[in-house]
Amino acid sequence: MQISSSEICELISKKIAKFDIISSMHNEGRVISVSDGIIQIYGLSDVMQGEMLSLPGDKYAIALNLEKNVVGAIVMGEYTHITEGTKIISTGRIFEIPVGSKFLGRVINALGVPIDGKGRIQEEKFLPVEINAPGVIDRQKISEPLQTGYKSIDAMVPIGKGQRELIIGDRQTGKTSLAIDTIINQRNTKIKCIYVAIGQKFSTIVNLVRQLEDNQALNHTIVIVASASESAALQYLVPYSGCSLGEFFRDQGKDALIVYDDLSKHAIAYRQISLLLRRPPGREAFPGDIFYLHARLLERACRVNSNYLKNILGTVNKFSTGSLTALPIIETQDGDVSSFIPTNVISITDGQIFLESNLFNSGIRPAINPGISVSRVGGAAQCQIIRKLSSGIRTSLAQYQELIAFSQFSSELDEITRNQLIHGKKLIEILKQKQYHPMSIAEQAIILFAAENNFLNDVSVEQIIKFEKMLLLFFNTNNSELVLSINNYKRINDVVENQLSDVINAFKLTKCWS
């Protein structure tokens, strides 16, 4: 059977008419080398810094090095399936993480994937892990306190909502415990917490999550993990992912707290990546942009004003604000705060809480050195009652330290000096606090009031801790309305002072602490 040329033309015309061309242009390249989670890609001609690159098997990489003919990228997760010649496709998007309120109470990895075995999390939206910090015009003055529950911090080194306060000290000095207690203290507030674990053992993280559960603090907390067994790429990414989760709450007009534990390991992970990418090393083999690494992360923690929220949410109350408070942790070696990473982060943050091994080993917990611990926000981040009652504590402790040094060279001391030494010892005992026992504003105010108004003069140093315990029990049992009033109004006046004095005098008649 023969087909004429006209029939052939007609068949071809029908086929062409039915043919649906779906064209999609994308930029692709090929892997030319793979080593230690770093891939070198040839052929990607149009790529952004930090862009997400698509790999086979639903995996992704982030472009970090942009050279003339080659792009250097870090693989997020396993890279054993990637070989020379593997096709890489650019996505045109910065790396994003799922965010939402349903992440509260869950443990996730750096990519936002749950690792606690409780099932999938329904995200509300996706946010870039790298985003510019709010500008100066968008920021609100820090004026509201974020209570840690520690007398020594809330009295001497107050932290405000939107502040960046560094926790620094040697290993095993209670840095993580302090941060976890701060999270626990937010259980009765509306503050959402994010704990970022960088380069830690899984056993440590499991114990930490269990402590949060036991203290009813996991429901308002997100734990985001890049453990020591995971790649340097994930350890580098995880604080930025955690920050995006915190910004989600901040930009809804809520208050959030984020703990980075710790940025020393984060810097080491970034150094490893930079050396593998053959970037020129600088001081301590860290790359030249190590300061910018932490600056762009910590600058995202702030308190934003109502105009900023209005641009995001539409209509808001003119007094509405949102905040993200950061508590970065840095581990020092043998108390050396002058090394590269500690000095960098000290210069970025709004103050530091310095924990000393000597104080920790001598039984002073938290082991805060009041001499070099400072909050650059100061009294603006304290409620009125704590600000008034704590005004003389730092001075008294400084005088005590001077007198201790002086008394070592003098065998005879006058009565005034002896009384100052005893008062200083009592203050140190008062500022001691057990782990997982944060205090309310009223409880702190009661103890500080007793110390500042000479109610401890007839209490020996050895009896201080028991005196404090029994005094708080007496208040909570017999004067719960006064305690509730102080917690609600957070102010002190002549009436409150008289009420406190009367109750403490009534308590002292019982002599139940001796």
From Swiss-Prot:
UniProt key word Acetylation: no
Coiled-coil annotated residue ranges, if any: none
InterPro entries: ATP_synth_asu-like_sf, ATP_synth_asu_C, ATP_synth_asu_C_sf, ATP_synth_F1_a_nt-bd_dom, ATP_synth_F1_asu, ATPase_a/bsu_AS, ATPase_F1/V1/A1_a/bsu_N, ATPase_F1/V1/A1_a/bsu_N_sf
Reaction(s) catalysed (UniProt annotation): ATP + H2O + 4 H(+)(in) = ADP + phosphate + 5 H(+)(out)
Top-rank taxon, per record: Bacteria
Family assignment from sequence similarity: Belongs to the ATPase alpha/beta chains family.
HAMAP family referenced in this protein's UniProt entry, alphabetically: ATP_synth_alpha_bact
The protein, known as: ATP synthase subunit alpha
